[in-house]
Amino acid sequence: MKIFPAIDIKDKKCVRLIKGDFNNKTEYEISPVDQAGKYKDHGFKNLHIVDLDGALTGETVNLDIIKEIVHKFDLKIEVGGGVRSIDSIEKYINAGVEKVILGSAAIKNKNFLKEACQKFPNKIALGLDAKDGYLSVSGWKENSNQLTLDFLKEVNDYGASRLIYTDINRDGTKESPNFEETTNVANVSNCPVIISGGVSSIDDIKKAKGLKNIEGIIVGKAIYDGDIKLEELVKELDA
């Protein structure tokens, strides 16, 4: 299973939000580039980056930082946060990013998702962020009226190569992921699923390994707060 240590960038700094709330954020002293280097040095191969400035503006605000991370370290990087155009996807792919995550823009406009998957085969990940079974959009500030599983069934054949499922109620809480709902999503999804939100311990990683159609797991706040040591986490890697 793949493990994706997370870097969320806001104002050029590493931050973590609680339940996606920009007013409830923790800033960390280490820079995004140095944090990526730390992950690389410990033997991680994959990285999950969210441009939180991009999530708010719809622009590739931290593209230069992401480019620097790509060029300095041989990591497979997935990037999300406010990607709303083919142009933005191209910028990230040209920068060397492995997969670009489409969230709100894909939920609001299914044709955009379909076009992106056709234009960039194997490069598009679908990011579904849900609260109480319903998808959220626009940096989690808006709830859509769409049930996660209903939406997934509609777009399942569009060609996304990865699905990242986040339970917003768990994100940044370190209360363990919502394994039950993630399993429901993985059972429906045509592509492999990444678990996100609430990872608190190595036990969560071990539990994720036993689930079907799960490609990997994203770990964020538990690393920054020292609940999970990178030395322990890297032992769980097998991809």
Swiss-Prot record:
InterPro entries assigned to the protein according to its UniProt record, in alphabetical order: Aldolase_TIM, His_biosynth, HisA_bact_arch, Isoase_HisA-like, Isoase_HisA-like_bact, RibuloseP-bd_barrel
GO terms of biological process kind: L-histidine biosynthetic process; L-tryptophan biosynthetic process
Tagged with keyword Isomerase: yes
Highest rank taxon of the organism: Bacteria
Residues at the active site: D8, D129
UniProt keyword annotations, A-Z: Amino-acid biosynthesis, Cytoplasm, Histidine biosynthesis, Isomerase
GO cellular component: cytoplasm
Class in the EC hierarchy, top level: isomerase
A Pfam family reported for this protein in Swiss-Prot or TrEMBL: His_biosynth
Enzyme Commission number: 5.3.1.16
Signal peptide, first to last residue: none
Molecular function, one GO term: 1-(5-phosphoribosyl)-5-[(5-phosphoribosylamino)methylideneamino]imidazole-4-carboxamide isomerase activity
Protein's cellular compartments: Cytoplasm
Intrachain disulfide bonds: none
Keyword Isomerase: yes
Pathway note: Amino-acid biosynthesis; L-histidine biosynthesis; L-histidine from 5-phospho-alpha-D-ribose 1-diphosphate: step 4/9
Main location: cytoplasm
Catalytic activity: 1-(5-phospho-beta-D-ribosyl)-5-[(5-phospho-beta-D-ribosylamino)methylideneamino]imidazole-4-carboxamide = 5-[(5-phospho-1-deoxy-D-ribulos-1-ylimino)methylamino]-1-(5-phospho-beta-D-ribosyl)imidazole-4-carboxamide
NCBIfam families with a match to the protein in the record: 1-(5-phosphoribosyl)-5-[(5-phosphoribosylamino)methylideneamino]imidazole-4-carboxamide isomerase (TIGR00007)
Alphabetized HAMAP family for the sequence: HisA
Family classification: Belongs to the HisA/HisF family.
The protein's name in its UniProt record: 1-(5-phosphoribosyl)-5-[(5-phosphoribosylamino)methylideneamino] imidazole-4-carboxamide isomerase
Lineage: Bacteria, Pseudomonadati, Pseudomonadota, Alphaproteobacteria, Candidatus Pelagibacterales
Gene designation per UniProt: hisA
